[in-house]
Amino acid sequence: MSRQDVNRSGEMEVFARVVELGGFSAAARALRMSPSAVSKLVARLEARLGVRLINRSTRKLQLTPEGSAYYDRSIRILDDINTAEREAAIGATPRGR
């Protein structure tokens, strides 16, 4: 797995928080990042994918059709990651003899 692959899940997480919380500033607060860093991560994701995911305006954020599809898929992937981590942690619980 390349370093780029590791970064993809982070980009996905940031993008999902922006959508769920309705904006870059709210996502930045939740993720303990600066709004600028969140905006740059989403812009980098869009550049890598070659498609705009979010139509930005001063008043509200609106997903493009591609952004909506990417969000739907992202939340399923992130849920799978969380489930895998939870299951691994349960299996790693120390047990007495």
Could you say what each language-model-derived stretch is?
Residues 2-21, 39, 68-71, 75-78:
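Short alpha-helical elements of helix-turn-helix
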Residues 29-30, 47, 68:
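Alpha-helical residues within the helix-turn-helix
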Residues 46-63:
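A short LG(V/I)-centered, amphipathic sequence patch enriched
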